[in-house]
Curated annotation (Swiss-Prot):
Record pathway: One-carbon metabolism; tetrahydrofolate interconversion; Amino-acid biosynthesis; glycine biosynthesis; glycine from L-serine: step 1/1
Family, per entry: Belongs to the SHMT family.
NCBIfam families linked: PRK00011.1 (NF000586)
Protein name: Serine hydroxymethyltransferase
Chain positions of site Plays an important role in substrate specificity: 227
Function: Catalyzes the reversible interconversion of serine and glycine with tetrahydrofolate (THF) serving as the one-carbon carrier. This reaction serves as the major source of one-carbon groups required for the biosynthesis of purines, thymidylate, methionine, and other important biomolecules. Also exhibits THF-independent aldolase activity toward beta-hydroxyamino acids, producing glycine and aldehydes, via a retro-aldol mechanism.
Reactions the enzyme catalyzes: (6R)-5,10-methylene-5,6,7,8-tetrahydrofolate + glycine + H2O = (6S)-5,6,7,8-tetrahydrofolate + L-serine
One term under GO cellular component: cytosol
Keywords for the protein's UniProt record, in alphabetical order: Amino-acid biosynthesis, Cytoplasm, One-carbon metabolism, Pyridoxal phosphate, Transferase
Disulfide bonds: none
Length: 416
């Protein structure tokens, strides 16, 4: 997208954008929650729709002149419902956290008990962390991973549900590399007369393509972001039934948000159309294949992975026995042009700003066009950067060479 208009008005911001574009182009982005949107998605976000205020919902706005943005939002809603086979969709949440807040407020009250995954075992801040609104407003009880398999302990989930009788059970994670059994969660929720919610922010693209089981047939509410594996703009989305839907709508507006971001909603519509295409399904299959290959290649080089592998787009490296922290690993890899994030591992003795692990994902490198052959090389580069930090510049040159073969945008009009 041509951003040359910025240069004459604000050269400092223009230079920041140019430097970030160069960083993304020349580096290996392996943060599991990051991806690269299409030019069409970016163009929608930079369109004249950013000028329009549109409080309310299609055909029920508090402002005039909303005919075109009504059409854009309706397209996004219809495409979300079609893609995920849901009765109801709300495309207005500004983020996944906002979507979760609205979902909670729709079906539970402050002080109610909720059962969700522990953050230190792979959950999310909005699943009851004490530093989040969720942990402050609701009584969260947490389940975790089996010490033996490092997978979700469904026996523990059932026992905690029976003991605490929560009003809501939440499944979904920010750092869990295995398939989640949504039906088993749903059965447990029904057994204690609880509602069931799924936060599928990380796996929405996989679900859309059918490479991960869908939570929609089993959950009362499903929330997600629209970026990550879905490869759209940064934002949120809520799916539910026609029965619960009106409660969600009123919590989003006027309960939590005011004016929706119509330029972002239009970009969501574009991304959802892309996600309905056969090429998107093939992309998601490659994401999973790349993750499996990368995981195996890392383990072949002596790395320890939580649960000994992956079923989805991400993996967790446990560095407890490597003599380095997650923070050190993030810095070593960063010096070599490889971007990851430090991440807690089960029973991590280190704090959240240090950690004993790193999280790695394949969505963005797959968007670049890389396949299984490249994943073996990526594993070698990761291993070298971690074990021989003095060779960082050598690794960085190899990273640049690899990335040059798989450019993010083949024409460089981002440079204005």
């Amino acid at each position: 997208m041509d951003i040359g208009a910025i240069k004459g008005v604000d050269p400092e911001v223009f230079e920041i954008i140019m430097q970030e574009a160069l960083r993304q182009q020349e580096g290996l982005e392996l943060i599991a929650s990051e991806n690269t949107t299409s030019r069409a998605v970016m163009a929608a976000q930079g369109s004249v729709l950013t000028n329009k205020y549109a409080e309310g919902y299609p055909s029920k706005r508090y402002y005039g002149g909303c005919a075109m943005v009504d059409r854009a939002e309706t397209l996004a809603i219809d495409r979300a419902r079609e893609l995920f086979k849901a009765e109801y969709a709300n495309v207005q949440p500004h983020s996944g956290s906002t979507a979760n807040m609205a979902a909670y407020f729709s079906v539970i009250k402050p002080g109610d008990t909720v059962l969700a995954m522990d953050l230190s075992h792979g959950g999310h801040l909005t699943h009851g962390s004490p530093v989040s609104f969720s942990g402050r407003l609701f009584n969260f009880v947490h389940y975790g991973l089996s010490g033996e398999t490092e997978m979700i302990d469904m026996d523990e989930v059932a026992a905690l549900a029976e003991k605490h009788r929560p009003k809501l059970i939440v499944a979904g994670a920010s750092a869990y590399p295995r398939i989640i059994d949504f039906k088993a969660f749903s059965d447990i929720a029904r057994s204690v007369n609880a509602l069931f919610m799924v936060d599928m922010a990380h796996i929405a693209g996989l679900v859309a393509a059918g490479v991960h089981p869908s939570p929609v047939p089993h959950a009362d509410i499903v929330t997600t972001t629209t970026h990550k594996t879905l490869r759209g703009p940064r934002g949120g989305l809520i799916l539910s039934s026609n029965e619960i839907g009106p409660k969600i709508s009123s919590q989003i507006f006027p309960g939590i948000q005011g004016g929706p971001l119509m330029h972002v909603i239009a970009a969501k519509a574009v991304a959802l159309k892309e996600a309905l295409s056969p090429s998107f399904a093939q992309y998601q299959r490659q994401v999973v294949a790349n993750a499996a290959t990368l995981a195996d290649a890392l383990m072949d080089r002596g790395m320890k992975l939580v649960s000994n592998g992956t079923d989805n787009h991400l993996m967790l490296l446990n560095l407890t026995h490597n003599g380095i922290s997650g923070k050190d690993a993030e810095n070593r890899l960063g010096a070599a042009g490889i971007t990851v994030n430090k991440n807690a591992v089960p029973n991590d003795p280190r704090g959240p700003m240090i950690t004993s692990g790193i999280r790695i994902g394949t969505p963005l490198v797959t968007t670049r066009g890389m396949g299984e052959t490249e994943m073996d090389l990526v594993a070698e580069l990761i291993t070298q950067a971690l074990e021989a930090p003095a060779t960082a510049e050598t690794v960085r040159e190899k990273v640049r060479s690899l990335c040059a073969q798989f450019p993010l945008y083949k024409d460089d009009t981002t440079r204005g």
